[in-house]
């Protein structure tokens, strides 16, 4: 049976969607957006918004008992793929070793107004 994660430390969806779901050691996130928790809006500054997205990823992983090193795939959905450099900064911080980076795919997407990036991650939870 699927176990859902609803984090009070990560932005929530307006639809009845958890932040992530776990089944048989596999964690899959829902779309992670860079909304401010206190105001439920997107920062105008794309760098701030991107930092929030990756910080929420870390929160969700931590609440599941995982780390960035357990991530096996990351999908990035950009309103404008020219913003990839903003994500690369956080990518390199989380996965500095090229030999131990997850698979990654960037997509152009129709995102909510004001949203520059949404990510979806897949991770294998540690045994034990």
Map each language-model feature to its residues.
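N-terminal presequence-like segments and the immediate start of the first folded domain
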Residues: 1-55, 59-72, 78-128
């Amino acid at each position: 049976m699927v176990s859902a994660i609803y984090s009070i430390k990560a932005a929530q969806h307006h639809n009845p969607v958890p932040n992530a779901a776990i089944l048989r050691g596999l964690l899959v996130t829902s779309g992670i957006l860079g909304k401010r928790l206190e105001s439920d809006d997107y920062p105008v500054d794309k760098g701030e918004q991107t930092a929030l997205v990756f910080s929420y990823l870390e929160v969700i992983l931590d609440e599941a008992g995982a780390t960035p090193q357990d991530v096996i795939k990351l999908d990035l959905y950009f309103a404008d793929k020219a913003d990839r450099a903003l994500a690369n900064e956080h990518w390199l911080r989380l996965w500095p070793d090229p030999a131990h980076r997850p698979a990654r795919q960037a997509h152009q997407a129709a995102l909510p107004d004001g949203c520059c990036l949404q990510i979806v991650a897949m991770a294998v939870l540690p045994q034990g």
